[in-house]
Every structure is written in C-alpha cells, then in structure tokens.
Amino acid sequence: MAAKKLVYGDEARAKLKAGVDKLANAVKVTLGPRGREVILEKKWGSPVVTKDGVSVAKEIELTDPYENMAAQLVKEVASKTADVAGDGTTTATVLTQAIYEEGLKAIASGANPIYVKRGIDEAVKIIVEELKKISKPVTGRKEIEQVATISANNDPEIGKIIADAMEKVGKDGVITVEESKSAETVLEVTEGMQFDRGYLSPYFVTNAEKMEAVLENPYILIYEKKVGNIRELLPVLEKVVQTNKPLLIIAEDVEGEALATLVVNHIKGVLRVCAVKAPGFGERRKAMLQDIAILTGGTAITEDLGIKLESVDLDMLGKADKVVVDKDNTTIIGGKGNPEDIKARIEQIKKQIETTTSEYDKEKLQERLAKLAGGVAIIKVGAATEAELKEKKDRVDDAVHATKAAVEEGIVPGGGIAIFRASRALCNIKEENTDKAWGIKIVKNACKVPLKQIAYNAGFEGSVIIEKIKDVDNVNYGFDAATGEYVDMVEAGIIDPTKVVRTALQNAASIAGTMLTAECLVAEIKEKEEKLPGAGGGMGDMDF
C-alpha cells in the first residue's frame, strides 16, 4: 500500500479553497449572455472552443493532490446538475465557490462547521419552497422556445428547432441530438419508441465514444422469460446469421452461457447482436412487450402462446430501421409494424386510460401511449468547422434537457433573478443558534453571486444592479445583461427552468457544506518512476 501524506485544519481548508477557486474561476467566465469562451486543448484533434460550463469543468485536473480533491468535488456539482437538469452547471459552480468562501470566513471566526452546514441546509429548503411559489407552468410554444434559446447561449435558431421538436413529439417524446453531414442544423422526426433498459454487457457497444450499441435494420426477438441455455437460442441465431442482419434480444434476462456466447460471437463479428432486459414488471411487462411487438411487426413470445424459443421463425421477429442502446435506454426507430395495428393499439390504450380509476395505472398507461404515439425527434446539428460543431452540439444538448426540465417543473425569471428574489424569504428567519444563523446568512449572500457574475461578464457592476432592483416588488423585475436594460425578465423572454435553478442550488450547497466540515485531507505520496535500463545491444527484439 502506498504511503500517504496528510494536512489538517487551516492548511487543509486553504488547499481546498485554492482548488475550488482554480476550477470555478475558469468556469464562471462563461456565465450569462455575454459570457466568454474557454479554449480546451485536446490530445487528439483541434482544440475545442466552448461556453459550456460542464465541458470546461470536466477538462480540469490540478497537479496539487489536495487542490485537485476540491476541483473534483466541484466538478461533481457541475456534472450532477447537468445530468439531472441539463443546464445550470456554471450557476452551480459559482454558488459552490460563494458558499464555501463565505463558510470559511465563518469557521475562521470560530463558528462550528457542523452547525454552519445545518444552517446552510435549512436555508436551501426555504429557498426551494420559495422558488416553487415564484414558478409558473409552461403553457405554450413561446415559452418553450424562449427557454431553449437561452440554454443554447441565446441562439434563436436552436430555440425554434427545439420548440418544433417538442411540438411534434410532445413532452413525453424522445429528442436525440446527432451531428449533421452538412453545415445546416435540421430537425427530423421518426416514429419510434424508447424504454429504460440498457445493454446487458458493455461488450455489445459498437460506438465506444458514446458507449452505444447501434444496430441498423435489425431483427428483434421479443421473449417473456429468461434465456440461460444457449441451445434454446441457437436455431433462431443460425437463421439470423444467414440473413447477415443484426439482432436485438429483449427478454426478462439473458444470463450465463447464453450471454457469454452472444458476447463472444459479437466480438468476433460472427453476429452483430445486443441483449437488453424487458421493460416493466409483471402484467405491465407483458403489455409493454406486446406494444413493442405491434410497433415492430413481430410476435411477443409469451408463456400463454405455448411457443418454445427453439421453434421461433424469422417472421415472428420484429423489424426496425435502427435500434440505439446505451447503458440506460433502448430506442427503437422506424418500427416495421402494420400502421393499422399500431393505431388500434393506441386507441385501446386511450380507452384504458379513460376507464382506469388508479392514478398510478393512468400514469403508466400514458407513458405507454407516449412511447407508441410520440416518436423520436432527431436534431441534426451542422456547422462550418469541427470545432464549431462540437461546441454547437453541446449547446443543443443543454437546451433540450433544459426545455424538458421547464415543461416538468415550470419556469422562473432568469438572469440570476429568481434565486436572488427567493433568498429574501431568509430575512424573516429568526435562528437562536448563532452558527446556524451564520449558515443561513451565507446562503443569502451566495444567492446574489450568479446575478453579480452575469453582470460582471457583461461589463457592468453587479453591486450597483442589486441596489437598483432589490426593493422592487415585481419578482420578475431584473437586469438584461445582453442589452444593459432593466426589464420584466419573463416578458423579455429571459427565463430559466425551475428545476435548473433548484438543482444548481441544492447540489452546490451539498458539496460546499460537505467541504466546510472537512478537517483533514489524505493523499497518496507519488513514487518516483525509476528509469529502466536500456535493452542489451543486438538482442532487443528477440523473445525467449
């Protein structure tokens, strides 16, 4: 086991602060409509120019191990916020830095870190409740377009395309982002279905960069039971191999020698195959398998049909134009089912929704309806250069996630205004414990920082702006950093998804609070690599 080195107390906190500052200072320059670009060096290919906070954060590794610990924790804030809400990564990073910096001042003045953290957590809960009160539901296309435009770094073209996509597939439909072969960014809508089951083995992956298994024109075997014995599968595998087409297996599970054999044959290139677990459970699983069968024109091989796996023919298998499987989801695009059968199935599910009394059943039926009727929208992103394409694709990805978040939890005024207004609720809190009160004050002050940073990046003084807007009763009243004017943010179309703002604050407070309670840092002492002596002359290439 490698030897460790340790630092304690103030020295540890100083190291953490240095790490937080290095990462946050690189990320926060991208915040707001006039945020700056960051250029990232790549080992292969051209450098990437980006204004996406999480892309910048992911690239940062620091040489000092203690500083790097802090940087990795802040990176986690950005990544987690991006995963959950799709946007707000820079805001989350800025808030983490602000909460940690203010918290260190409290600790240096003798406050108990545990009580300070409790105060921070209490304040965050109050602000989240306040955000819910400020939040408004998304009612029309205009708001969807505004959210998408802002999340795509104020690009109205992307905003319009995403609004079109949401309109065509609905809020429950699937929107994927791909690279276009031309310089144009276009929207394609394809009938399709997605369910939340990923590949059973990463060895099925065909695109290592995206960690996806992509099957073009595959056959689809839909089986209700587990597959453990490869002999059961062999007849259908042999038939599929003769057609030279890939195969997607959807079953309760594929395990043991059956899975091992599929993996080996896939790696050797004998058969392009991918196995996934069937979606749902119990009777609902049977219904979902039937949905997939109708969509793809196949037969769901269920126990009550009395068909054995060995006797399955090619005409019982479903077909599709394309199947994309990642570690969490399977998307079937262009199912070759009979349109009349699909329509009849949709009507059947609609009738079930009308007659069911259970809210849970209704929700699950609506999910199935969306999967059958929604389809898949593909946004093909185009640009003049590879560097611009990568940057634009990142922005479109962000905007799609943020738009879905807006539909889910509603919208609040943007530009850092919502969190600033919500923090006013903390003024009414009377906390007897002085250390907890300090924690509440820390969050109140931190909530001003995103607004200040947006203004600073646009060349304005944030403190002056806060003084001008703080006493105005209209919660939507704020500062448009793009034009330098004071406006009603919602009317001006400057809005953020509530989920983005909420997630950014919760994640920032969680990590910053955790770092404040740290008293000791432990890192490995790196051993010096000894240079190996050169090989003997004349015999260097010989094996013995």
UniProtKB/Swiss-Prot annotation:
GO cellular component: a single term: cytoplasm
For molecular function, the Gene Ontology terms on record are:
ATP binding; ATP-dependent protein folding chaperone; isomerase activity; unfolded protein binding
Its keywords, alphabetically, are: ATP-binding, Chaperone, Cytoplasm, Isomerase, Nucleotide-binding
Q: Which SUPFAM superfamilies match?
A: GroEL apical domain-like (SSF52029), GroEL equatorial domain-like (SSF48592), GroEL-intermediate domain like (SSF54849)
Residues that, per the record, bind ATP: 30-33, 51, 87-91, 415, 480-482, 496
Question: Pfam families given for it?
Answer: Cpn60_TCP1
Q: Which GO terms are recorded in the biological process aspect for this UniProt protein?
A: protein refolding
Please state the Enzyme Commission number of this protein: 5.6.1.7
Catalyzed reactions per annotation:
ATP + H2O + a folded polypeptide = ADP + phosphate + an unfolded polypeptide
**Annotated compartments:** Cytoplasm
Protein task: Together with its co-chaperonin GroES, plays an essential role in assisting protein folding. The GroEL-GroES system forms a nano-cage that allows encapsulation of the non-native substrate proteins and provides a physical environment optimized to promote and accelerate protein folding.
Q: Which HAMAP family match?
A: CH60
Describe the family membership recorded for this protein in Swiss-Prot or TrEMBL.
Belongs to the chaperonin (HSP60) family.
Q: How does it assemble?
A: Forms a cylinder of 14 subunits composed of two heptameric rings stacked back-to-back. Interacts with the co-chaperonin GroES.
**NCBIfam families for the chain:** GroEL (TIGR02348), PRK00013.1 (NF000592), PRK12849.1 (NF009487), PRK12850.1 (NF009488), PRK12851.1 (NF009489)
Q: What is this protein identified as?
A: Chaperonin GroEL
Name its species: Sulfurihydrogenibium sp. (strain YO3AOP1)
